[in-house]
């Protein structure tokens, strides 16, 4: 069919109004131009084709957005298209953040004994922005009742919400409760959650005030579970943005039935199911928040969960990120952090490690709760490392033992070695305070082997029963002066600027089911640890021999 311009058709551009005498639009790409003013259509056209009817999008009187709706980018377009150029909104609340404590100093200031770098207020400010508020961080308020009262009084007259950090417990210089009582009213002091129990909820000059505990993890959970809801409430909405997955617990968790407890976990996706491995639970362990992939909430009425229980975990990452995570449960070493960093640099996959000791790693491998385990287990009968333990604990599964590094274990002591400790015998002779690794760790097994060989009774060592879960934690206790010696790897001593007395060389290896060697994430991890970049980082740390790195031994 041929059409003549001005008779059968007119030319319009996208978005133009259609003249009343026309009722169909044919796209230019569906036409054959016979001449400058004549076209031929190549397929049938029907009435109202390619025409947007008046009222198809928005008509007068139509509800565009309901009350208490959070305006999204797409909503702005709908409002303007509907002729609505102004709307009444809830204002973003102005939030005053007041850090308190004589012991606090600003980042970058010179530190003296007893000083603590103040960082909670900066975390709060970022969280408040994320929740939709406008944060203002005050200068550190020292532990002076009158001065703190004046600061809080002024803030309550200028801001919508006040966050008072630290001083919510019952110590001699914990003034938060007294200040709030003097200026206003305390509704609640202490709630049944852990961490975060000492929180204070009150009002000053009819403004809500929250006294937040000083411990970083406690503070984080109060912000997430109370302050976030408060900021949402004053803005007229309640965002339920927690995302949950069902996961299997890799170990037993005990909890007090007095509190709702928040437990940080590592997550992995193994053989079609999610695995949750609990990590540090202390209220002051800031890195547990950084390292966590999710949070398990243990209800107040429960005393915990058994290993293997299916639980709901609030995830802090996307499910895709978790499914692209390689989970390592086993013995700790700093080189795992280096490998994790280099793997993340490549893009798709990440390495997530939980430190439970070598035996704990093998048991997780046996129960199909980890992709691989890092182990350094000495067979005291043969002097061989790792192979016999894999055979003993996992007899019915083909396991590959990947040679990782040989490393030096030794005594870590204060710089300058003030007690002149040169052997394990000196620990006993000089009454040195020892800090140990946990039962089931390869370092603990090595220590017990050496003590037995030397005829030393563990009961004669002061601190033998005092346990830490990583080499760096042992080194930190010595560096702080809380212990005189501990057994660990050279790299940990170097990082904490300690002296090091070598005791033994050991094999730190990777045990992995043979079928997992075909996983893309595992292949990329193996590429990382065999790379020159990784080996260069080992050289910088010192104390590692990687001459056999990457060699695979199949154990059946």
Question: Where would I find each of the regions flagged by the language model?
Answer:
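Short, glycine/charged-enriched hinge/interface segments at domain edges or termini
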Residues: 1-139, 275-280, 311-317
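Short loop->beta-strand "edge-of-pocket" segments that line small-molecule binding or catalytic clefts
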Residues: 323-332, 424-445
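Periplasmic-binding protein-like
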Residues: 396-408, 498-527
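Ligand-binding cleft/hinge of the Venus flytrap
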Residues: 338-347, 424-425, 437-439, 443-466
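A ligand-binding cleft/hinge motif common to bilobed small-molecule-binding domains
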Residues: 374-392, 475-504
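Flexible glycine/proline-rich
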Residues: 58, 181-323
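N-terminal segment of the mature folded domain
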Residues: 344-426
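Helix-rich terminal scaffold detector
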Residues: 87-212, 216-221, 342-347, 374-378, ...
């Amino acid at each position: 069919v041929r059409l003549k311009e001005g008779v059968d058709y007119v030319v319009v551009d996208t978005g133009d109004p259609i003249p009343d005498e026309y009722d169909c639009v044919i796209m230019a790409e569906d036409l054959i131009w016979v001449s400058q003013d004549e076209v031929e259509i190549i397929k049938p056209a029907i009435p109202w084709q390619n025409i947007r009817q008046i009222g198809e999008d928005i008509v007068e009187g139509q509800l565009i957005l309901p009350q208490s709706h959070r305006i999204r980018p797409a909503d702005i377009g709908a409002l303007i298209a509907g002729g609505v150029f102004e709307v009444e909104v809830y204002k973003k609340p102005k939030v005053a953040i007041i850090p308190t404590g004589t012991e606090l100093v600003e980042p970058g200031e010179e530190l003296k004994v007893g000083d603590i770098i103040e960082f909670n207020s900066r975390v709060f400010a970022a969280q408040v922005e994320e929740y939709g508020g406008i944060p203002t961080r005050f200068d550190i308020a020292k532990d002076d009742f009158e001065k703190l009262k004046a600061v809080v009084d002024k803030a309550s007259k200028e801001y919508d919400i006040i966050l008072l950090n630290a001083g919510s417990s019952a110590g001699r210089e914990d003034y938060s409760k007294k200040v709030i009582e003097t200026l206003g009213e305390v509704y609640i002091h202490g709630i049944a959650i852990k961490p975060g129990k000492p929180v204070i909820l009150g009002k000053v000059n009819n403004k809500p005030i929250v006294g937040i505990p000083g411990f970083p993890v406690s503070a984080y959970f109060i912000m997430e579970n109370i302050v976030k809801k408060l900021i949402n409430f004053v803005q007229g909405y309640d965002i339920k943005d927690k995302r949950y997955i069902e996961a299997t617990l890799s170990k037993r968790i005990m909890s007090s039935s007095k509190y709702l407890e928040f437990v940080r976990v590592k997550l992995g996706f193994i053989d079609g199911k999610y695995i949750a491995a609990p990590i540090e639970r202390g209220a002051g362990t800031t890195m547990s928040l950084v390292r966590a992939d999710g949070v398990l909430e243990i209800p107040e009425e429960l005393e915990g969960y058994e290993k293997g229980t299916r639980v709901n975990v609030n995830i802090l990452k996307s499910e895709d990120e978790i499914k692209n995570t390689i989970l390592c449960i086993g013995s700790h070493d700093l080189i795992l952090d280096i490998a994790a960093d280099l793997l993340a640099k490549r893009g798709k996959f990440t390495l997530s490690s939980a430190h439970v000791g070598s035996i704990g790693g093998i048991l997780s491998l046996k129960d199909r709760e980890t992709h691989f385990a890092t182990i350094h287990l000495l067979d005291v009968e043969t002097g061989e490392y790792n192979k016999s333990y894999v055979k003993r604990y996992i007899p019915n599964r083909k396991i590959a033992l990947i040679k990782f590094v040989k490393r030096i274990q030794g005594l870590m002591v204060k710089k300058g070695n003030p007690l002149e400790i040169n052997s394990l015998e000196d620990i006993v002779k000089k009454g040195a305070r020892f800090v140990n690794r946990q039962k089931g760790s390869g370092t603990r097994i090595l220590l017990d082997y050496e003590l037995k060989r030397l005829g030393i009774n563990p009961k004669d060592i002061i601190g033998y029963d005092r346990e830490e879960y990583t080499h760096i934690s042992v080194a930190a206790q010595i560096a702080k002066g809380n212990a005189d010696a501990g057994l660990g790897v050279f790299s940990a001593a170097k990082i904490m600027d300690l002296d090091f007395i070598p005791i033994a060389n050991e094999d730190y290896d990777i045990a992995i089911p043979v079928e997992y060697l075909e996983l893309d994430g595992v292949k990329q991890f193996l590429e990382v640890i065999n790379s020159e970049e990784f080996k260069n980082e080992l050289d910088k740390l010192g104390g590692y021999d990687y001459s056999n790195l990457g060699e695979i031994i199949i154990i059946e």
